[in-house]
């Protein structure tokens, strides 16, 4: 009887530990998240399954309240509210699909995993355990994803100890042979530490400073230089002409974040600039829900939010390379990367502007997610972040 009383507490505490450690921003700790389905399956009631799901997700996304408070220069309450709301889809899906029947449980968990990987539930599908596939099975590609998914199903059965041992073996093998993600030849990502001024300070001098940074990095065979999300601020013909003129006489191609505005809202974009001109290269598929993407705006007659281009432009072309672009929030959810991988890109370019995440592990988690997917599909990775 005492054991029955303690089990819900122990499972909930364990799920919090798993969420905290697995999503701490260290690539080799990602497989810890695979313990979540074990804990979920050990719940004896739907209520306990809900507590386990909430504990895991809230721990994994623990940096959100502080980040939102920094972004809006407000107290913690708005962030706490968003944190709880964001956990809703994860908790609801895993609570509704939980079952006592052991024969149905693997298929119920598979359905939950799929729902949290694709829209609409996948819009807040952070902390997905399947991301660990890149750590366990580097270079396996789609077969690694299949193996991880099958293993996740096995972890909710009576065979879970054997599956866990197998996963641990692959984990140790991967850790022993771990190497940093390779940077593609002729590409260079630039990390900046310009805080909240990046994209907001749109002075000519700021652009000249960025141009100088680009030219400094474009050496030793580097021809493609990547700048962080929002680095150029608003995308205008004036700034385009400034950059194109500055790049005359060079072979440099710049890929940078910017905002393209029109009468109906704006797109969070990547633009490409060279001596031949500039153009919008990529429009973000999934902006940050709430702060950027505000679907209720159309119902209220407002049009100041970022547009979501859900399944558009999964791969773009830069020179002779096919690129899978990921901007900020897209690195935290599953489907943008997997959609891009269907088109067999040559490399992944992941950018972000995480000044507002100071003191949290959000940027580290974004980087780790990008690294994990690049490892799984054996793709070169270019990272560029502002903090």
From Swiss-Prot:
Transmembrane segment boundaries: 16-36, 51-71, 76-96, 110-130, 135-155, 159-179, 252-272, 332-352
Superkingdom, natural source: Bacteria
Gene Ontology CC entries for this record: plasma membrane
UniProt function note: Enhances conjugal transfer of the plasmid.
Membrane topology category: Multi-pass membrane protein
Gene3D superfamilies: Carbon-nitrogen hydrolase
Keywords, ordered alphabetically: Cell membrane, Conjugation, Membrane, Plasmid, Transmembrane, Transmembrane helix
Protein name: Probable conjugal transfer protein TraB
Keyword presence, Transmembrane helix: yes
Location of this chain's protein in the cell: Cell membrane
InterPro entries registered for this protein in UniProt: C-N_Hydrolase, C-N_Hydrolase_sf, Conjugal_tfr_TraB_rhizob
Domain CN hydrolase: 187-387
Stated family: To A.tumefaciens Ti plasmid TraB.
């Amino acid at each position: 009887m005492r054991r029955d009383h303690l089990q819900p507490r122990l499972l909930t505490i364990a799920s919090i530990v798993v969420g905290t450690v697995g999503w701490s921003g260290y690539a080799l700790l990602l497989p810890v998240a695979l313990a979540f389905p074990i804990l979920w399956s050990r719940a004896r009631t739907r209520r306990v399954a809900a507590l386990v799901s909430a504990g895991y997700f809230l721990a994994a996304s623990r940096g959100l309240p502080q980040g939102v408070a920094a972004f809006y220069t407000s107290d913690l309450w708005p962030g706490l509210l968003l944190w709880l709301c964001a956990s809703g889809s994860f908790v609801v899906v895993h609570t509704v699909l939980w079952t006592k029947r052991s024969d149905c449980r693997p298929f119920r968990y598979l359905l939950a995993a799929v729902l949290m990987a694709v829209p609409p539930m996948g819009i807040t599908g952070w902390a997905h355990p399947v991301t660990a596939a890149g750590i366990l099975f580097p270079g396996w590609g789609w077969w690694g994803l299949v193996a991880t998914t099958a293993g996740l199903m096995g972890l909710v059965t009576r065979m879970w100890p054997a599956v866990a041992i197998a996963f641990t073996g692959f984990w140790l093998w991967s850790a022993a042979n771990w190497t940093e993600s390779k940077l593609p030849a002729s590409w260079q990502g630039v990390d900046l530490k310009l805080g909240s001024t990046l994209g907001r300070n749109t002075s000519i001098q700021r652009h000249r400073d960025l141009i100088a940074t680009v030219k400094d990095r474009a050496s030793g065979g580097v021809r493609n230089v990547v700048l962080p999300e929002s680095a150029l601020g608003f995308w205008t013909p004036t700034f385009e002409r400034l950059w194109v003129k500055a790049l005359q006489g060079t072979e440099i191609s710049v890929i940078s974040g910017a905002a393209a505005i029109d009468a109906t809202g704006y797109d969070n974009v990547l633009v490409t600039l060279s001596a031949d001109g500039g153009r919008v290269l990529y429009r973000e598929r999934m902006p940050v829900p709430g702060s950027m993407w505000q679907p209720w705006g159309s119902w209220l007659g407002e049009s100041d939010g970022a547009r979501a281009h859900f399944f558009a432009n999964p791969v773009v072309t830069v020179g002779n390379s096919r690129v899978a672009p990921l901007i900020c929030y897209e690195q935290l959810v599953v489907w943008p990367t997997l959609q891009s991988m269907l088109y067999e890109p040559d490399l992944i370019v992941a950018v972000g502007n995480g000044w507002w995440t100071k003191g949290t592990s959000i940027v580290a988690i974004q980087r780790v997610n990008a690294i994990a997917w690049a490892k799984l599909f054996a793709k070169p990775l270019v990272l560029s972040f502002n903090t």
